[in-house]
Amino acid sequence: VAMGFALTVTYPQAGNIGGGGFMVIKTKDKVTTIDYREKAPAGSTRNMFLNEKGDFLPEKSQVGHLSAGVPGSVAGLLYALEKYGSMTREDVLAQSIRLAEDGFDMEEKLAESLNSNYDLFNKFPSARKVFTKGGLKYTAGEKFVQKDLANTLKLISVHGREGFYSGITAELIVKEMQQ
């Protein structure tokens, strides 16, 4: 669970609180899975990615606000922690909060990944703010600081699921999606 939150900070292209996932857990007595994939929003329709002729429009399902689902990562990771974990939420999230707040030296692979999506990030102000350096490309070795993410992780640390799915974080997500 701690690694899932740490990946949100250090490897956002593979792990993040805006998406979903699944987990296999092995205890002394059994093996189980948790599916916390993102879900389609309530306003979704079966034809939302089709044009007037009924042809599939892949770009609509892959890029932009219509392609987003309701995130499941926070609920799934916290469920795993509550049901199978041995640490407190605060302890599990502490290092991820520190990494996001203080930053870390960006490795070459992360810089390359972010820069490979540079044009796409620049189309969306909220993505540009996080995943570019003031609209410029990142360079390996630069400090990658994510204060807003640190604040969100703090809310999750203190309030659990409600720190993400209710309150200011949820309001900001809804506001962004409605624009």
Predicted regions and their residues:
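Noncatalytic scaffold domains of N-terminal-nucleophile
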Residues: 2-179
